[in-house]
From Swiss-Prot:
Disruption phenotype: Decreased dipeptide uptake in bone marrow. Decreased cytokine expression in response to LPS stimulation. Expressed in kidney brush border cells (at protein level). Highly expressed in macrophages. This is Solute carrier family 15 member 2. The keyword Transmembrane helix applies. The modification Phosphoserine is found at residues 9, 28. Residues 1-57, 109-113, 161-183, 239-295, 365-380, 633-643, 696-729 are cytoplasmic. Residues 1-34 are annotated as: Disordered. Belongs to the major facilitator superfamily. Proton-dependent oligopeptide transporter (POT/PTR) (TC 2.A.17) family. Proton-coupled amino-acid transporter that transports oligopeptides of 2 to 4 amino acids with a preference for dipeptides. Transports neutral and anionic dipeptides with a proton to peptide stoichiometry of 2:1 or 3:1. In kidney, involved in the absorption of circulating di- and tripeptides from the glomerular filtrate. Can also transport beta-lactam antibiotics, such as the aminocephalosporin cefadroxil, and other antiviral and anticancer drugs. Transports the dipeptide-like aminopeptidase inhibitor bestatin. Also able to transport carnosine. The lineage of its organism: Eukaryota, Metazoa, Chordata, Craniata, Vertebrata. Optimum pH is 6.0 or lower.
Amino acid sequence: MNPFQKNESKETLFSPVSTEEMLPGPPSPPKKSTPKLFGSSYPLSIAFIVVNEFCERFSYYGMKAVLTLYFLYFLHWNEDTSTSVYHAFSSLCYFTPILGAAIADSWLGKFKTIIYLSLVYVLGHVFKSLGAIPILGGKMLHTILSLVGLSLIALGTGGIKPCVAAFGGDQFEEEHAEARTRYFSVFYLSINAGSLISTFITPMLRGDVKCFGEDCYALAFGIPGLLMVLALVVFAMGSKMYRKPPPEGNIVAQVTKCIWFAICNRFRNRSEDIPKRQHWLDWAAEKYPKHLIMDVKALTRILFLYIPLPMFWALLDQQGSRWTLQANKMDGDLGFFVLQPDQMQVLNPFLVLVFIPLFDLVIYRLISKCGVNFSSLRKMAVGMILACLAFAVAALVEIKINGMIHPQPASQEIFLQVLNLADGEIEVTVQGNRNNPLLVESISSFQNTTHYSKLRLETKSQDLHFHLKYNNLSVHNEYSVEEKNCYQLVVHENGESLSSMLVKDTGIKPANGMTAIRFINTLHKDMNISLDANAPLSVGKDYGVSEYRTVQRGKYPAVHCETEDNVFSLNLGQLDFGTTYLFVITNITNRGLQAWKAEDIPANKLSIAWQLPQYVLVTAAEVMFSVTGLEFSYSQAPSSMKSVLQAAWLLTVAVGNIIVLIVAQFSGLVQWAEFVLFSCLLLVVCLIFSVMGYYYVPLKSEGIHEATEKQIPHIQGNMINLETKNTRL
């Protein structure tokens, strides 16, 4: 996550509401001297702002890290709906900064805007946490509380986004420009620290702590909510130390009105008798000053280059949705640590901290020494290509995962597994209505196999005839089956005879890295088995079959079991990621219950570490595209237009999330094909952007009405420097 994108307040390092960038307004009151931090040139008030930002980023990213799995496993939405709502929320977080900037510029000022919208932010966390308490109402109430909470959070985080960093910049005197430069570096580090820590911790709160016998989403949302309360309290504590510039007018609104007036005026004066004007924006000259029109002209040249950018964000922001769902189907055991699927996102902020200085101090300098003109637009194009490669790698990983997933029966098909609990080998023959053998198989006693036989039906539902041979016994049974289901035929001795029962199997690999288990009780007593904080699992006597129960991956050496007159312990051993187990309780010994363990569906075998290459590629793409993009944009835009440019940049991110939302709902593609689609779309967009960049003529500083010398952002490692220099590409 870099200082400009992927985080909602990272983009505010050059704020749309900076007082330095506004058109001339009413004179500001003289700035008062503020106490310094430990005798330095830093205002003491900066400490409150930096701590506030750390807590707010912890709050936002901590909540967002577990959001997709909350939709999937708490609200029980499907993957497409979960992805769509996730990106709709992300998109809303990028639309609301325009509202926050307008409120701060035109009405309340930055300080009051941060305070009031932080209260809205906290209220959103309250609703979100209440919507994650299982005993509070039903699914409808949980959904309503969650959506209301997310809407308030989007308004809060987006609204304060364009204000916090700029408000910190307002605290410095003009003669302390170097200290202000270091402030932006510290501010950026606080953002990534909050993101890094929260993305690692909140999945642990969700998965390792149990609430009401389930994953503790209420705690995973509640702790970020408390951090937002802390952020608000800390920020308010510094109130008397802050410099609070008054609102000076909304430049975004002025630019919008100027463009709209020019368009309307042009259409009102379409007569051939009226002389044409050199540029379509010149039609605003009747109402707006020349310097504003010149600035808007410079702005539109850059906005034209922004047209292809949303597709890049469409790929980048899927780390928290589609890539988390992919990690959900992989083996998180790294040997020294078990990684939760939603913890993989922690790689992004960690790699950003490594890559920004690496690229700036090593890679870019080496390329420069080779005599290659690696311009800003070329860096952005290479960033797009790296994102394409990241999704191509993600597609390959998805294909590999699909090859390991247990297949599902198609139309007019069933899968059948025979489980032999007798003392010797049995022969099974399955026949259809036409007495044609669908299956002939010999099964050893207690044979552990994950093999399912595929049987073709004549209709959607059908009666099948089972012929069992055991020693000198021959038994015939008839069972009804339905298409697209998996079944287990359980065969066992019954005195001197042979009995069987057909049990419907789940046939589906447990999601979220969970383990699914069920029991067959061969004893003559009913049994209750306590696996977790939920109600005990009941298993009837004499080959009773329990329901499936999903539990966390791990070791279960002493599971509590009860009959009506005794208590036992049962060692289940290691239960692995994504596995379905059957335990057949066979007898009682001095050491407790004895059970035979069968693996019906094998574990997730592909390590989650295989996602590392795609995360490395997409983070490198983010550093090259996002950091460079704003550096280029700000070097090419007049200072009065930087706020509008910031709003436009955020809008490209919002549109990118909308693209993902649309594709998730309407593409109908399998996941690996969707990854390939996004990769190909971005490749096409990259070619278009490259052509646009080839014909782009850098704007000379002399071509702007402003002075030749101006402040433009310069990125140096993870430092954000405001240097005075000529505007050159």
